[in-house]
Curated annotation (Swiss-Prot):
Residues covered by region (Disordered): 218-261
Protein name: Bidirectional sugar transporter SWEET1b
Keyword Membrane among UniProt keywords: yes
Family, per entry: Belongs to the SWEET sugar transporter family.
């Protein structure tokens, strides 16, 4: 019964995480249509890519037995994020943006290759699992912490305009599903980061409940409603906030953070 419950929560986590991975599609359709990345940042997609690669590697049977569902969704996520990065490279608005994205992609490939090679050639058994698990967990926690800038923006503007309800709910449900999956599998490398994700998702929902009647109250956003642009903010766009300043560069909302396991 415990194995069945673990499997069901893993499948649930896969479905919700896939929704989160695909949430930036409207943003990239806009980039392709306009043939420019405009003021979007490619950093969140590179960061999500390294997290997906490390998590997918960790879930492989020769690293962490009985965690194949971790590999399936993160493998799919790695393919999707790679496509996003390629779009950024092709349609970069400036040469500097293209070089920066290419440099980050090279760093991602180097870090993943280093972890994979060391774990394969120098480590075995629990030592291999420990290295890969720690690497994946550190990246996951960093990704889950990224919505803090969006939450700060919500508190500052007293508006949930940049934090769509469905995205926040999906982050909470995804983090919770993988948290329970990790508990049932007694795997701290799945439980710890996703426990953080579930908690931050819950905080986002609380903030939404507090400020839900203040959509568009931030002023300088031109009355923009939840929709593609909200998702774009969630994916790291350098959006302008009410006081005329820029939101934190390269920030990501729960949409991406919520996919890491």
């Amino acid at each position: 019964m415990e194995d069945l419950a673990k499997f069901l929560f893993g499948v649930s986590g896969n479905v919700i995480a896939l929704f989160l991975f695909l949430s930036p599609v409207p943003t990239f359709w806009r980039i392709i249509r306009r043939k420019s990345t405009e003021d979007f940042s490619g950093v969140p997609y590179n960061m999500t890519l390294i997290n997906c690669l490390l998590s997918a590697w960790y879930g492989l049977p020769f690293v962490s037995p009985n965690n194949i569902l971790v590999s399936t969704i993160n493998g799919a996520g790695a393919v999707i994020e790679t496509a996003y990065v390629v779009v950024f490279l092709v349609f970069a608005s400036t040469h500097k943006t293209r070089l920066r994205t290419l440099g980050l992609a090279a760093a991602v490939a180097s870090v993943f290759a280093a972890v994979a090679l060391v774990s394969l050639l120098a480590l075995h058994g629990q030592h291999r699992k420990l290295l890969c698990g720690v690497a994946a967990t550190v990246c996951s926690i960093c990704m889950y912490a990224s919505p803090l800038s969006i939450m700060r923006l919500v508190i500052k503007t007293k508006s949930v305009e940049y934090m769509p309800f469905l995205m926040s709910l999906a982050v909470f449900l995804c983090g919770t599903s993988w948290f329970i999956y990790g508990l049932l599998g007694r795997d701290p490398f799945v439980t710890i980061p996703n426990g953080c994700g579930s908690f931050l998702g819950a905080v986002q929902l609380v903030l939404y409940a507090i400020y839900r009647n203040n959509k568009g109250a931030g002023g300088g956003s031109g009355g923009k409603q939840a929709g593609d642009d909200d998702v774009e903010m969630a994916e790291g766009r350098n959006n302008k906030v009410a006081d005329g300043g820029a939101a934190d560069d390269d920030s990501t909302a729960g949409g991406k953070a919520g996919t890491e396991v």
